[in-house]
C-alpha cells in the first residue's frame, strides 16, 4: 500500500511531467563515465534542464555533468566507488541491486562492469526524480523502485550481488535489516555493505543520544567486531573487511547544490577527530558478506 501511494505521488509530481516532456524530445546524448557521470547533448533544452536540476536540490550523490552544467554534489561519491572498484568484477553478467540508491550515481558507474540487470531501491520521490532526469538523457536500462530494504524478502526477484551503502546505521533493527538483505540473495550471493563504525576491539556499538554528527536518525554505530556479530546472527557465513576510511571535508562538503550545512559544520571546531556532540568523527568500514 505504501509503495503504491509513493508511486502515485511520484507520477503526479509536476517535475515528473517536466522530465517526461524532456524525455519525449528524445535528445541525442553521449553518455560517458569518469569521476562524473557525463551527458553531452548539445541540445536547445539547456534552460529547461537547468531549471529542473535547480528544483531538484539538494543533490547529495554525484557529481554529474550535463553539457556545460556541472552538478557539484555534496558528496564526491567517486571516492567511495573507487574503494569498491577493485571488486566490481563480481557484478559482471549478474543480477545486481543497490539498496538506498539515492539518485543512482553508483548504478550509472556500475554500467561499465556489464551487470545483466541493475535495480535501485529507494523510497524517496526526490531522489527518484533526480534519477529520472539523468536517465531521460542517458537512456540506460537501469530500473528504480520506490521501495526500501524491508521490501526485499517479498520483491519476487533475487539478486546475485546487493550493494547497501550508508543505510544500516539509519535502521533501528540492524540485524533485521541484514536478514532482509540475505532474503534478497540468490544462492552464493554476496552483499557489499558500508557503515560508520567506532574504533574499539570490543563487540559494542555506540547508541547516540539524539544526533550523531548532527544527523538525527542514527541508531547504532558499531565496532567492526559488533558488525561481524550482527552479520553472523543474520545468517551470513562470510565476512571480509575490504577497507576503512575516515570521512573528510574533501569527500563531503557544502556546495551550491545543497541548501544546508555539511561535514565541516558537524565536527567539533576545536578537534576534527570529534563530532560536534563529542563522539568519534565519522569513519567508514567497507565489508563483503556472503551466505
UniProtKB/Swiss-Prot annotation:
GO MF annotation list: transferase activity, transferring alkyl or aryl (other than methyl) groups
Superkingdom of the organism of origin: Bacteria
GO biological process: tRNA wobble uridine modification
Pfam family, one: Methyltransf_9
Entry-linked CDD domains: AdoMet_MTases
Enzyme Commission code(s) on record: 2.5.1.-
InterPro entries (alphabetical): CmoB (IPR010017), Mo5U34_MeTrfas-like (IPR027555), SAM-dependent_MTases_sf (IPR029063)
Binding positions (carboxy-S-adenosyl-L-methionine): 61, 75, 80, 100, 122-124, 149-150, 169, 284
Keywords of this entry: Transferase, tRNA processing
Gene3D superfamilies xref list: Vaccinia Virus protein VP39 (3.40.50.150)
SUPFAM superfamilies registered for this protein in UniProt: S-adenosyl-L-methionine-dependent methyltransferases (SSF53335)
Disulphides: none
Catalysis performed (reactions): carboxy-S-adenosyl-L-methionine + 5-hydroxyuridine(34) in tRNA = 5-carboxymethoxyuridine(34) in tRNA + S-adenosyl-L-homocysteine + H(+)
Family: Belongs to the class I-like SAM-binding methyltransferase superfamily. CmoB family.
Purpose of the protein: Catalyzes carboxymethyl transfer from carboxy-S-adenosyl-L-methionine (Cx-SAM) to 5-hydroxyuridine (ho5U) to form 5-carboxymethoxyuridine (cmo5U) at position 34 in tRNAs.
Subunit structure: Homotetramer.
Protein name per the record: tRNA U34 carboxymethyltransferase
Organism: Campylobacter jejuni subsp. jejuni serotype O:6 (strain 81116 / NCTC 11828)
Amino acid at each position: 500500500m505504501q509503495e503504491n501511494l509513493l508511486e502515485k505521488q511520484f507520477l503526479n509530481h509536476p517535475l515528473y511531467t517536466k522530465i517526461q516532456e524532456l524525455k519525449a524530445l528524445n535528445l541525442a546524448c553521449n553518455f560517458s563515465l569518469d569521476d562524473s557521470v557525463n551527458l553531452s547533448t548539445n541540445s536547445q533544452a539547456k534552460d529547461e534542464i537547468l531549471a529542473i536540476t535547480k528544483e531538484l536540490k539538494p543533490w547529495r550523490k554525484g557529481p554529474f555533468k550535463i553539457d556545460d552544467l556541472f552538478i557539484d554534489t555534496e558528496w564526491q561519491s567517486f571516492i567511495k566507488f573507487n574503494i569498491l572498484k577493485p571488486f566490481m568484477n563480481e557484478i559482471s553478467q549478474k543480477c545486481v541491486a543497490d539498496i538506498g540508491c539515492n539518485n543512482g550515481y553508483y548504478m550509472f558507474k556500475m554500467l561499465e562492469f556489464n551487470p545483466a540487470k541493475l535495480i535501485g531501491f529507494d523510497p524517496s520521490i526526490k531522489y527518484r526524480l533526480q534519477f529520472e532526469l539523468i536517465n531521460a538523457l542517458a537512456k540506460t536500462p537501469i530500473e528504480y523502485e520506490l521501495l526500501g530494504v524491508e521490501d526485499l524478502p517479498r520483491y519476487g526477484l533475487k539478486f546475485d550481488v546487493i550493494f547497501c551503502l550508508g543505510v544500516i546505521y539509519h535502521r533501528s533493527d540492524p540485524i533485521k535489516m541484514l536478514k532482509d538483505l540475505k532474503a534478497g540473495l540468490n544462492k552464493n550471493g554476496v552483499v557489499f555493505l558500508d557503515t560508520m563504525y567506532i574504533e574499539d576491539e570490543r563487540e559494542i556499538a555506540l547508541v547516540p543520544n539524539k544526533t550523531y554528527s548532527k544527523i538525527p536518525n542514527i541508531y547504532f554505530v558499531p565496532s567492526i567486531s559488533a558488525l561481524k556479530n550482527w552479520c553472523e546472527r543474520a545468517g551470513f557465513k562470510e565476512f571480509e573487511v575490504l577497507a576503512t576510511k575516515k570521512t573528510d571535508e574533501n569527500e563531503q562538503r557544502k556546495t551550491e547544490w545543497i541548501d544546508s550545512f555539511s561535514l565541516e559544520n558537524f565536527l567539533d571546531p576545536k578537534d576534527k577527530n570529534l563530532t560536534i556532540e563529542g563522539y568519534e568523527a565519522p569513519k567508514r568500514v567497507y565489508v563483503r558478506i556472503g551466505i
